[in-house]
């Protein structure tokens, strides 16, 4: 009984202690979408004709965790969720954290996975009409296609003078992770105009909303601009260097000397076949049966390399090679000297910018909804755990509890796959080294009688790599057989010479000649196979 009371009190204390924390998180969380349940009813798919992509409620590969899935390739997608709040989220007060997960399960070659944080729309707007023209306050997230590879952070800020909304892009944003793992993207906006971009909880970029070094175009225009009415004077000389007017071409400067001349010291290689053409007609070619001389013209056999040239240093007319002409100097030109009339590169004078204004704090548009409006060539993009919070600690808590466990599992799986692939590559590399060694062994001169057999074994092993060990054993046996033959059988073979066996010796010689021919042909065959 006493133990039950202690247990009950402990549970009560835990509940009481955790209650303020839960309330604190709820107070700081404007939106959290886990996609644990089907998104129908909470998210509205655009009904515009161009958005044909089908959104699905699917599990992330290898997990029981659900997300919002891009299910088809080469489609436009549009979906939106309005914030369930009384008033749109004010971005000009305190800290605001935007965070979500994205996973490219099929990789990403050309497509986006960014979110648009929509400002309040015009009267009469409905979520079903969401499209690319629906105005947003912030666009944030990965985008990759061609030369584009960045995690966008774009502000649409209203110019206080013109009243027009202008896109301001964060300069030098982080790159998109190139793997197929789950990644979490976080943007933190602070009240001191600081903006931070995190990928997987690690800060990748920090900037200031009002800094011209961090945003293009800058939110605050420059105080001065080039005078559009100013024009360069006609006598303004921008040439820093000019040809020396007093320079004279040297008398020994030959402008007509060629860059290359024949090498008079070169001699025609011995054995050069002057009367043999480099190419000859293919003797095995025959005129096609359907060839019509009147329509197709006179048939000519295709050309092939002249086999006689393979053993010779060359065929056809021999010509001396060319070499660089030591007397070559090229066209003469006057050396350059400093221009005494040089005034520098002209630029218009600066005048006060009529569009200049000052800001202590950007007037960011509030957020009323979240939209995903993308055109992607890949399917398998999964969105999950979309969060808008006023506290960085809340965002960190969600990263650790929702993203980190999945990422760790995926990372371990990827590591195991990479190791397996590495072992396979290592085995292939080992086999290649073995075969290279075996080919060198086959070329040893005193093994010429066995070369055809060794080559046959090697070629068989190359087509069936699992036989590599067996081939090694076979070649070792050949070595041992030859070794014992040389030690125990070599002397007797030299002493005995019988005339009746001359025919047999001739036959053996012919056999060896054939084997040598095969041995010569075998490396050539091997080279061709390797080159192909």
Curated annotation (Swiss-Prot):
Residues 225-358 are annotated as: P domain (Extended arm). Ca(2+) binds at residues 34, 65, 384. The keyword Endoplasmic reticulum applies. Residues 226-242 have a biased composition (Basic and acidic residues). GO terms for molecular function: calcium ion binding; carbohydrate binding; unfolded protein binding. The chain crosses the membrane at residues 469-489. Sequence repeats lie at residues 227-238, 244-255, 263-274, 282-293, 297-307, 316-326, 330-340, 344-354. This is Calnexin homolog 2.
């Amino acid at each position: 009984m006493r133990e039950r009371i202690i247990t009950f009190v402990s549970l009560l204390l835990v509940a009481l202690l955790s209650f303020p924390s839960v309330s604190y998180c709820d107070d700081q969380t404007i939106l959290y979408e886990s996609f644990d349940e089907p998104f129908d009813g909470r998210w509205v798919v655009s009904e515009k004709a161009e958005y044909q992509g089908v959104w699905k409620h699917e599990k992330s590969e290898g997990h029981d965790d659900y997300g919002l899935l891009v299910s088809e390739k080469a489609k436009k997608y549009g979906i939106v969720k309005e914030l369930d709040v009384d008033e749109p989220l004010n971005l000009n007060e305190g800290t605001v954290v935007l965070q979500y997960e994205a996973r490219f399960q099929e990789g990403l070659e050309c497509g986006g996975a960014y979110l648009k944080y929509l400002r309040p729309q015009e009267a009469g707007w409905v979520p079903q009409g969401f499209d690319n023209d629906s105005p947003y306050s912030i666009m944030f997230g990965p985008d990759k296609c061609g030369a584009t590879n960045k995690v966008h952070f774009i502000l649409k800020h209203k110019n206080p003078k013109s009243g027009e909304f202008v896109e301001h892009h964060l300069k030098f944003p982080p790159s998109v992770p190139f793997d197929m793992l789950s990644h979490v993207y976080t943007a933190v906006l602070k009240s001191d105009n600081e903006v931070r971009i995190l990928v997987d909880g690690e800060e990748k970029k920090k900037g200031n909303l009002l800094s011209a070094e961090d945003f293009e175009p800058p939110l605050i225009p420059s105080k001065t601009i080039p005078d559009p009415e100013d024009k360069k004077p006609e006598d303004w000389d921008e040439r820093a260097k000019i040809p020396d007017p007093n320079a004279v071409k040297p008398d020994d400067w030959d402008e007509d000397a060629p860059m290359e001349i024949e090498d008079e010291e070169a001699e025609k290689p011995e054995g050069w076949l002057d009367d043999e053409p480099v190419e000859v007609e293919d003797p095995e070619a025959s005129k096609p049966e359907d060839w019509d001389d009147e329509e197709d013209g006179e048939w000519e056999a295709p050309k092939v390399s002249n086999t006689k040239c393979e053993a010779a240093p060359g065929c056809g007319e021999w010509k001396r090679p060319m070499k660089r002409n030591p007397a070559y100097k090229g066209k003469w030109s006057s050396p350059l000297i400093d221009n005494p009339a040089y005034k520098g590169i002209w630029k218009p004078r600066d005048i006060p910018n009529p569009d200049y204004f000052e800001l202590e704090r950007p007037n960011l548009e509030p957020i009323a909804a979240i939209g995903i409006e993308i055109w992607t060539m890949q399917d398998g993009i999964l969105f999950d755990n979309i969060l808008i919070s006023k506290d960085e600690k809340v965002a960190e808590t969600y990263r650790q509890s929702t993203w980190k466990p999945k990422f760790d599992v995926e990372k371990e799986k990827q590591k195991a796959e990479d190791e397996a692939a590495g072992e396979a590559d290592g085995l292939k590399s080992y086999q290649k080294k073995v075969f290279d060694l075996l080919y060198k062994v086959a070329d040893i001169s005193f093994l010429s009688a066995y070369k055809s057999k060794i080559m046959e074994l090697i070629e068989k092993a190359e087509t069936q790599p699992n036989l590599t060990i067996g081939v090694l054993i076979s070649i070792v046996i050949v070595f041992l057989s030859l070794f014992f033959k040389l030690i125990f059988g070599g002397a007797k073979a030299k002493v005995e010479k019988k005339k009746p066996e001359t025919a047999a010796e001739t036959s053996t010689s012919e056999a060896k000649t054939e084997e040598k021919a095969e041995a010569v042909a075998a490396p050539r065959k091997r080279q061709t196979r390797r080159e192909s």
